[in-house]
């Protein structure tokens, strides 16, 4: 199979064509984002902005991946696992978004319901990997390579659930999670290309194409949000790609902003529950910088630069 930009172009085209129609449909139905009460007050003006846009780039990415791999006669079990992870987590997010819109509230699925769904999808991915004779090897720093299917399965479960939620936490500003995801998926596309892993190249390029098309409508001021349907799909996809490239730890650098966003929430909760004091003005940490007076664009650009630096450092040292 030869390298081609067809996955990117086709996914981009599908998103750019159908997203405006989706935005128009959501506006006609008066279906828009419900802004959380505890969020920054200036975000209240975003209330009513169409959401669930992730459905469009998610489907565009999947359609592009499928037709290119079928055309190239390279559709294998790895491709199906990537698609199932991407779609599976996206469906959980879709249900979450749908409940929020239907009941006109900021609470969708309950935490345990969302977690259960994420665990089920992760368990399905692990089962399919077993049937595909995937090498259940995990390199643990200072301990070396560990070949233990049970330990590896627990790690995959944690990785998929953790990073799907990490991207979700980062989706709080116009264009932020979209830009960070483009950087991360582009980095993995390059790694997959270097390793001649064409299935992952096609998948990542398809996702990038959809994201670039989506960014046209999602940058500030956003005409649409991706919703949990998009952010959970992106996080689940990234985690699965890192595992199937046998480079799971790479996501700590390539997805460094997602990691920092998650850590800020964890530290804030621990600090408040143990001392009654908050470390940050508001979490996830992008809101902290907003509270310091940074504009959304400034936060976006600085965070994108941090994400890009993390990816470059990884490629220089281990790429």
Curated annotation (Swiss-Prot):
InterPro entries: Glycosyl_transferase_4 (IPR000715), PNAcMuramoyl-5peptid_Trfase (IPR003524), PNAcMuramoyl-5peptid_Trfase_CS (IPR018480). It holds the Pfam family Glycos_transf_4. It is a multi-pass membrane protein. One of its GO terms (biological process) is cell wall organization. Keywords: Cell cycle, Cell division, Cell membrane, Cell shape, Cell wall biogenesis/degradation, Magnesium, Membrane, Metal-binding, Peptidoglycan synthesis, Transferase, Transmembrane, Transmembrane helix. GO terms for cellular component: plasma membrane. Pathway: Cell wall biogenesis; peptidoglycan biosynthesis. This is Phospho-N-acetylmuramoyl-pentapeptide-transferase. It comes from Lactobacillus johnsonii (strain CNCM I-12250 / La1 / NCC 533). The lineage of its organism: Bacteria, Bacillati, Bacillota, Bacilli, Lactobacillales.
């Amino acid at each position: 199979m030869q390298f081609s930009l067809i996955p990117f172009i086709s996914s981009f085209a599908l998103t750019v064509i159908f997203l405006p129609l989706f935005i128009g449909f959501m506006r006609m139905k008066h279906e828009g984002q419900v802004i959380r009460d505890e969020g920054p007050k200036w975000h209240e003006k975003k209330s009513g902005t169409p959401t669930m846009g992730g459905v469009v780039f998610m489907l565009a990415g999947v359609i592009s991946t499928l037709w290119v791999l079928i055309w190239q006669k390279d559709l294998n079990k790895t491709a199906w696992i990537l698609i199932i992870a991407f779609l599976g987590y996206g469906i959980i997010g879709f249900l979450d978004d749908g409940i929020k819109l239907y009941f006109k509230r900021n609470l969708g699925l309950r935490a345990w319901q969302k977690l259960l769904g994420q665990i089920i999808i992760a368990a399905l991915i692990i089962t399919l990997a077993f049937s595909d004779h995937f090498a259940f090897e995990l390199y643990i720093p200072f301990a070396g390579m560990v070949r233990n299917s049970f330990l590896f399965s627990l790690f995959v479960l944690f990785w998929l659930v953790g990073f799907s939620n990490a991207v979700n936490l980062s989706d709080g500003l116009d264009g932020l999670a979209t830009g960070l995801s483009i950087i991360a998926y582009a980095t993995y596309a390059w790694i997959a290309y270097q390793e001649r892993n064409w299935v992952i190249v096609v998948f990542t390029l398809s996702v990038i194409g959809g994201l670039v098309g989506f960014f046209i409508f999602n940058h500030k001021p956003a005409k649409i949000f991706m919703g949990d349907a998009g952010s959970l799909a992106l996080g689940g996809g990234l985690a699965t790609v890192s595992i199937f490239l046998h480079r799971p730890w790479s996501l700590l650098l390539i997805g460094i902003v997602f990691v920092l966003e998650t850590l800020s929430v964890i530290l804030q909760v621990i600090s408040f529950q143990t001392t009654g004091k908050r470390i940050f003005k508001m979490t996830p940490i992008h809101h902290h910088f907003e509270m310091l007076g940074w504009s959304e664009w400034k936060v976006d650009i600085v965070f994108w630069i941090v994400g890009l630096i993390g990816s470059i450092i990884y490629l220089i040292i281990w790429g």
